[in-house]
UniProtKB/Swiss-Prot annotation:
Location of the protein in the cell: Plastid, Chloroplast
Reactions mediated catalytically: Hydrolysis of (1->6)-alpha-D-glucosidic branch linkages in glycogen, amylopectin and their beta-limit dextrins
Key words of the record: Carbohydrate metabolism, Chloroplast, Glycosidase, Hydrolase, Plastid, Transit peptide
UniProt lineage: Eukaryota, Viridiplantae, Streptophyta, Embryophyta, Tracheophyta
Name used for this protein in its record: Isoamylase 3, chloroplastic
Function of the protein: Involved in starch catabolism. ISA3 removes different branches than ISA1-ISA2, namely short chains that prevent amylopectin crystallization. May be the debranching enzyme required to assist beta-amylases for starch degradation in leaves at night.
One of the GO BP terms on file: starch catabolic process
GO cellular component: chloroplast; chloroplast starch grain; chloroplast stroma
Amino acid sequence: MLTSPSSSSTYDPFSSNFSPSLTNAFSSSFTIPMGLKLSRRVTRARIFSRKIKDRSTLKVTCRRAHERVVEEEASTMTETKLFKVSSGEVSPLGVSQVDKGINFALFSQNATSVTLCLSLSQSGKDDTDDDGMIELVLDPSVNKTGDTWHICVEDLPLNNVLYGYRVDGPGEWQQGHRFDRSILLLDPYAKLVKGHSSFGDSSQKFAQFYGTYDFESSPFDWGDDYKFPNIPEKDLVIYEMNVRAFTADESSGMDPAIGGSYLGFIEKIPHLQDLGINAVELLPVFEFDELELQRRSNPRDHMVNTWGYSTVNFFAPMSRYASGEGDPIKASKEFKEMVKALHSAGIEVILDVVYNHTNEADDKYPYTTSFRGIDNKVYYMLDPNNQLLNFSGCGNTLNCNHPVVMELILDSLRHWVTEYHVDGFRFDLASVLCRATDGSPLSAPPLIRAIAKDSVLSRCKIIAEPWDCGGLYLVGKFPNWDRWAEWNGMYRDDVRRFIKGDSGMKGSFATRVSGSSDLYQVNQRKPYHGVNFVIAHDGFTLRDLVSYNFKHNEANGEGGNDGCNDNHSWNCGFEGETGDAHIKSLRTRQMKNFHLALMISQGTPMMLMGDEYGHTRYGNNNSYGHDTSLNNFQWKELDAKKQNHFRFFSEVIKFRHSHHVLKHENFLTQGEITWHEDNWDNSESKFLAFTLHDGIGGRDIYVAFNAHDYFVKALIPQPPPGKQWFRVADTNLESPDDFVREGVAGVADTYNVAPFSSILLQSK
């Protein structure tokens, strides 16, 4: 348990015997009391810092009331710095370059003291503590305005300075405070973060997170002909993916220096173009803590949080996704290069953002890195007993609708739009953002409205995951202000159940593929406000959905208690991998059925990375902690499936792009769709057919799904005058006959639709 130093303890900074005792790793740090209480004039502090291995005595001498000179008695001194400091500016929060120097500003409502810690080490090594840190104690009578602490330091380098804060305050845990001056804290507004250098290196699991800055590099060159794709929402096809997992596997053929990095991602953009998607939804790329599980009392050393839902900071790109070592300045530049390359390829960038919790866990497994130690009572939701509320399922819940936290989130979003040119955001567990500071649901959450109405964010796609771990399920009811789209969880469940052959699902399936009007039309929203998906990072992959009835999460080390138990999956007759040709053929059909259903549905489709070749996690439906082939894209598997599985997936996506009847702006009217069904009330009917009418060129589309385990003879309607039907897709056929872009003529008045298969016809 962490405890704060007693507020009654005293020390004499002018005593020759004074030697500060810091329990932080920075054993060589020393403190410079800023003598600003009697004068608002600037002060000078002469600081002799050196790389020490021993404990030398510090001798402090008072020269004037507003000036301190710190001389260090040591056998060797390697560097001398002269700093000039002033009270600083209250805004903006974080670090900024001002006329006088470098300004630092930090919010803390309940802190009683704040100390700025600086390291001028140019080594960039993880053992910065050996290089010593300079500590500047802020005087609240000079360096504080309202609840913001601030100081300006002159003569600092314009980059490669590491910094953090020590914050002290009331020590009463029962009052909701978690102050501990012994911990060096990361600035919540740090735009760049220096963590450990190597992704997943357990030897660095206790490495410090520092803020840093770069005011020296030239602005990134976006290019004179650069432009945003600006793809209409109705035209999006989203590809959910993990930056590291995309190229980390050796099968990617990457140089190890760029495998799993932003630059490695760029090398594989042609694959995304071949597939046909036009938007990537990146699993978290904010600086996150992948080693959180390895610090617990019974650590799971094999677990590395590769999904990234363990946010350390909301402004900085993940430094360990940079090429080579985890350099934050390089990470920022290479992230921009990735965005620029994606935009040049006509692909938008949507970030999966985690504003519902942070990496600081709970009071059982506390790991204070920033918010908790700066002002726990402001940044986190607390119950009436001042204990952490846990609507995120991760131990803490960010206090999103507190004015200060709300502004932090808005500033973060604006930063990613203006600095990194991203096109949109998917908000993880967004129902948390709809809760008041006491955790109660809000019908008109200030944060949700502010995001929707913000002028900087006006062109962005904003997508909610409309549920949380506290039971606030808002699918179809998420506050939207005509802006917010939603992950349509009901689409996932209903489509899974129909395709696998559950009874009584035909009506629900019809509602989902036609745009979920029951969820969105009633609230004056558009079909594209529903993001349709069958598979996402949570849960089974598409291949596992048709290969496993039960989750197999033993490798996670949680005794099978993690991951969802109700997956609406069907193993097609055998649990797991099999060599049975009949079962393998059935599984292939089912995967194609799911993909075809997704791409012909009204709304915005989203698919998961790897499903285009049939990636398996061997039944693990919660693989967040595996930095292995379990999550990594398998490029050799893609090569093996390029001419069949991948080809079908790609062709269906491109077919969607070229047919406006599959992506209506508004909900379908009677003249735009015909249902070929006369027994809607038959709960045992598992066959659905309909025609989408093209009122412009007469290129109607007929689609039929058969979820029975027997053939169904479908009666094919008459084509438009002067047209005939062409078979474009039949998931029962082998490649390349399963999808023929130009179509195959000769479709009769009836069509025998095979068990667990689907067809698509087009009139020409």
